């Protein structure tokens, strides 16, 4: 504990009410957030002579200040604790690293409803189905729904400005409600109802209604209509046969946990209306010395109680671990949801099978993750040996991408001891250089990246320069001129020249621009990690360049038209669903866009045609 922190004096001021406490280090950084039913009793436990663990000892040794927030109830304290954890990301708390809100399928409340993927706050009028484990699961479901129930998925701006049906109508993936006369209001409403039932898990009702309609069409000698409905029935049956369905139609989240070698995996299985929508594995950041019970309690609290997560709470949560605060968690979730939420730890029947499945998935995912990390550690250790460094904890790699010198983008990719650190990948738009001058581009990106203060932990041990001797010379020149408060001599600059025909395994490495290069055997683990980060950097640069090029392509044609400024360009692209939609639009359709007169619409039409 810091000499400046007087624990005895502080504890005299602490109340015995419930609340939340925040611990700070000498730098004023929050290092731990906790909650307590009795603040005085809980905080006193930190300053006993016999502390529970080394983790607690390390924490207490750094305390410089403690702030306390008193709450009315334990539930308030629990909610506030997890909001503070999200805000401060304290070093000694278990942290849920995935902060994305879950995607839903959104069925809008329009006259002709549309289907779309949705994340975030649910402000738009309509119905939300989910949550789904990831965006891929939503897109896959939307593609399936489009084949079975062809209701529109286009944006309202596109829908409102169409005078003729799009390609989706031509291939039978949309009923074309945008054009009068293509589909009756009754038929469209019926298909929307099928979608609603299907997404609610009521497949049997969908099939019953479809079979009745098919039989009626057949009796009326409407054989084409009967055949179309028959195909719908078969499609629905094919989908439902593939799903693992429980005997009950409950909404459940099932949470399995695995813990090994200081790493935890929490696997969440999402079940809605008795069907498994999907699952996701999480690897929370676990401080050393943390016990499994704390990992599970903190994860579950953060997973459901951090307000911005926008999670939809199921009626029941199944856990394979007993929580000391299970009742408090259930009460907090109940208060949050406005309905009773049960937390179960010893289920039977189907629920026990689900829990076993989640536990198995957690163990499998953790084994895979540890194996990947072991491989990365071996490769970095081999690289450190080759480069004669004590260790390689952090690497950064740079690459340049452009087309004939235009839209130049530089990428910076970061690897740490566990591999790619994608949250720290960066792209830089390069400007003010001679088109096609890769040396100037490399010079600029390195100055922008390193010509400023850098945290000690973020100084790379190795900087890879993709491009060989010339690019390495630029890097050496930049670092020689840097005037920065950190140790600019710490990073080892390494040039990587592509092999003949750009074949993997034939790379040449350079320590000095004028020196002789050297190669590593094709089966060298050190070479493999160099190839990995180099390929990541290359892909990241190309991805940024393509986005930039596409943006220029979408706006450059419109920029040449007199009277079409940035706001009108944006409005045109928004209402027409992009440049291609605008190219296909008639003068009358263009004139319907706000701010576009008939005369300007004609000018835009003819400019795009010629």
From Swiss-Prot:
GO cellular component: a single term: excinuclease repair complex
Primary residence: cytoplasm
Matches recorded under SUPFAM superfamilies: C-terminal UvrC-binding domain of UvrB, GIY-YIG endonuclease, RuvA domain 2-like
Classification via InterPro entries: GIY-YIG_endonuc, GIY-YIG_endonuc_sf, GIY-YIG_UvrC_Cho, Hlx-hairpin-Hlx_DNA-bd_motif, RuvA_2-like, UVR_dom, UVR_dom_sf, UvrABC_protein_C
Signal peptide (residue range): none
Cell compartments where the protein resides: Cytoplasm
GO biological process, one term: nucleotide-excision repair
GO molecular function: DNA binding; excinuclease ABC activity
GIY-YIG domain segment(s): 16-94
Keywords associated with the record: Cytoplasm, DNA damage, DNA excision, DNA repair, Excision nuclease, SOS response
Cysteines paired by S-S bonds: none
Keyword Signal (UniProt): no
Keyword ATP-binding listed: no
Residue intervals of the UVR domain: 204-239
Protein task: The UvrABC repair system catalyzes the recognition and processing of DNA lesions. UvrC both incises the 5' and 3' sides of the lesion. The N-terminal half is responsible for the 3' incision and the C-terminal half is responsible for the 5' incision.
Subunit and interaction comment: Interacts with UvrB in an incision complex.
Full protein name: UvrABC system protein C
Native source organism of the sequence: Escherichia fergusonii (strain ATCC 35469 / DSM 13698 / CCUG 18766 / IAM 14443 / JCM 21226 / LMG 7866 / NBRC 102419 / NCTC 12128 / CDC 0568-73)
Gene that specifies this protein: uvrC
């Amino acid at each position: 504990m810091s000499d400046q922190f007087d624990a005895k004096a502080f504890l005299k001021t602490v109340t015995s009410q419930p609340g939340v406490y925040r611990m700070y280090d000498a730098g004023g950084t929050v290092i731990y957030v906790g909650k307590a039913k009795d603040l005085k009793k809980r905080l006193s436990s930190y300053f006993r002579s016999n502390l529970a663990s080394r983790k607690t000892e390390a924490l207490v040794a750094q305390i410089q200040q403690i702030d306390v927030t008193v709450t009315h109830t334990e539930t308030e304290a629990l909610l506030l604790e997890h909001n503070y954890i999200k805000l401060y990301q304290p070093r000694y708390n278990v942290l849920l690293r995935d902060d994305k809100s879950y995607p839903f399928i959104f069925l809008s409340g329009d006259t002709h409803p549309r289907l779309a993927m949705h994340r975030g706050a649910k402000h738009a009028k309509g119905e939300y189905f989910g949550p789904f484990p990831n965006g891929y699961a939503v897109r896959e479901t939307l593609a399936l729904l489009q084949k079975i129930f062809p209701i529109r998925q286009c944006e309202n701006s596109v829908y409102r400005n169409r005078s003729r049906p799009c390609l989706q109508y031509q291939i039978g993936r949309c009923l074309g409600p945008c054009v009068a006369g293509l589909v009756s209001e009754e038929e469209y409403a019926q298909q929307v109802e099928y979608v609603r039932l299907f997404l609610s898990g009521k497949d049997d009702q969908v099939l019953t209604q479809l079979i009745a309609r098919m039989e009626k069409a057949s009796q009326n000698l409407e054989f084409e209509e009967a055949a179309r409905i028959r195909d719908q029935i078969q499609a629905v049956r094919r989908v439902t046969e593939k799903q693992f369905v429980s005997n009950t139609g409950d909404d459940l989240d099932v949470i399995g946990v695995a813990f090994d070698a200081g790493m935890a995996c929490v696997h969440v299985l999402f079940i809605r209306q008795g069907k498994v929508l999907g699952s996701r594995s999480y690897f929370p950041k676990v401080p050393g010395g943390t016990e499994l019970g704390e990992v599970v309690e903190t994860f579950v609290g953060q997973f459901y109680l951090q307000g911005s997560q926008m999670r939809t709470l199921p009626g029941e949560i199944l856990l394979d671990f007993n929580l000391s605060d299970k009742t408090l968690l259930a009460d907090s979730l109940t208060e949050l949801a406005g309905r009773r939420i049960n937390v179960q730890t010893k289920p039977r029947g189907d629920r026990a099978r689900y829990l076993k499945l989640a536990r198995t998935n957690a163990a499998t995912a953790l084994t895979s993750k540890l194996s990947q990390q072991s491989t990365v550690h071996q490769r970095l250790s081999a690289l450190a040996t080759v480069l004669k460094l004590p260790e390689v904890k952090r690497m950064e790699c740079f690459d340049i991408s452009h087309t004939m010198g235009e839209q130049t983008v530089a990428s910076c990719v970061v690897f740490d001891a566990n591999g790619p650190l994608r949250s720290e990948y960066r792209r830089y738009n390069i400007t003010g250089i001679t088109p096609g001058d890769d040396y100037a581009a490399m010079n600029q990106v390195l100055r922008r990246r390193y010509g400023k203060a850098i945290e000690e932990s973020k100084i790379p041990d190795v900087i890879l320069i993709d491009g060989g001797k010339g690019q390495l010379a630029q890097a050496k020149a930049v670092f020689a001129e840097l005037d920065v408060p950190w140790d600019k001599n710490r990073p080892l600059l390494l040039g990587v020249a592509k092999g003949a025909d750009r074949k993997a395994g034939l790379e040449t490495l350079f320590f000095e621009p004028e020196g002789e290069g050297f190669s590593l055997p094709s089966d060298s683990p050190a070479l493999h990690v160099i190839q990995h980060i180099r390929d990541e950097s290359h892909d990241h640069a190309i991805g940024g360049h393509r986005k930039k090029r596409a943006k220029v392509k979408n706006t450059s044609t419109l920029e040449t038209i007199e009277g079409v400024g940035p706001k009108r360009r944006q409005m045109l692209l928004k209402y027409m669903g992009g440049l291609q939609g605008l190219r296909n639009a008639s003068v009358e359709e263009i004139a319907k866009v706000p701010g576009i007169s008939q005369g300007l619409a004609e000018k835009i039409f003819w400019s795009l045609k010629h």
